[in-house]
Regions:
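Short, low-complexity, Pro/Ser/Thr/Gly-rich segments in the mature regions of secreted, periplasmic
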Residues: 251-270
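Short, conserved catalytic or interaction motifs in soluble domains
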Residues: 19
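The tetratricopeptide repeat
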Residues: 33, 68, 75, 137-150
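Short coil/linker segments at helix-helix boundaries
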Residues: 22-36, 48, 52, 78-134, ...
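C-terminal motif of bacterial Sec signal peptides marking the signal peptidase cleavage site
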Residues: 13-16
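Sec-dependent signal peptide recognition
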Residues: 2-8
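Short, charge-rich amphipathic alpha-helical segments embedded
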Residues: 53-85
Length: 270
């Protein structure tokens, strides 16, 4: 490609920028120079190096800045398993599949570390609430929530072979621990709260329709609990709802068939 696409720039500027964005920054010094360096590390998928620059070389003031936090969140997202362009491209290419399978399938054959998605989301929360962040930032948060769910399900439920094959290998009702299902609950909450910032052109019409459907179904069953992003607020009924959704064939990666009747979802896990 003639112009190198920068991952973080793409993430927060909706694919409108290339390397020329940083031309003038390359001549700057101090914190701005370190920001530029960290940006380059993220573009090269050297996430630990980017994190090291942001957390050890920037001044305290710069570390608390929006740009530094965006880069830091992108770095942790990368460690979780997210390549923004690759992931959204795979979502856009999905023509079929249930909601949770759509989220999980891009991580088949990929090493995943869901805990770093949690750290990335915590970092974005430091920038501000959903109401105070920009649309682009909220779109990134929604994607991080989706990636948290996808990496969690692939890592916790699709365990054979070692990097998964797209099918669940554990009993989704009892074989996924509370701590593990909490990743799915929290990821769902972030996706749900920020989903309006995502366009169908970014994630594809089928993925958009499918994910919107599972958001609506969860809201019908559990109301505002489907937007929980604080682990301390998670209750047993919320975990049950998410387990039920994941166990269904229509929304999840399980075998329980509802025939399209959402009233049957709560019976997926007895």
């Amino acid at each position: 490609m003639k112009n190198k696409i920068f991952i973080v720039s793409v993430t927060f500027l909706l694919f409108s920028c290339n390397g020329n964005l940083f031309t003038e920054l390359s001549s700057k010094t101090g914190d701005e120079d370190y920001i530029f360096l960290a940006q380059k590390y993220v573009d090269q998928m050297q996430y630990d190096s980017a994190i090291n620059v942001i957390t050890t070389q920037l001044s305290a003031v710069a570390q608390n800045g929006v740009k530094a936090r965006e880069i830091l969140a992108s770095s942790y997202g990368g460690k979780c398993g997210l390549n923004f362009i690759d992931y959204t491209g795979k979502l856009a290419a999905q023509a079929t599949g249930s909601s949770f399978y759509i989220l999980m399938s891009p991580f088949i054959g990929v090493v995943v570390q869901p805990q770093f998605c949690r750290t990335a989301l915590d970092t974005m929360e430091l920038i501000g609430t959903t109401e105070s962040r920009t649309v682009n930032q909220n779109a990134f948060v929604a994607v991080l929530g989706m990636v948290l769910m996808g990496t969690a399900l692939r890592g916790y439920a699709d365990i054979a072979p070692a990097l998964g094959d797209g099918t669940a290998d554990v009993d989704l009702c009892v074989g996924v621990t509370n701590a593990q299902i909490d990743d799915v609950v929290i990821g769902f909450g972030y996706m749900s709260k920020n989903f309006s910032a995502l366009s169908s052109s970014l994630i594809g019409g089928n993925s958009s329709t499918s994910l919107n459907a599972v958001i609506n179904s969860c809201s019908t069953i559990a109301g505002s609990s489907c937007q929980i992003t604080d682990e301390a607020a998670i209750t047993a009924p919320v975990r049950d709802t998410v387990r039920d959704l994941v166990q269904t064939a229509e929304y999840g990666i399980g075998t329980y068939a509802t025939g399209g009747n959402d009233l049957l979802v709560p019976g997926a896990c007895p």
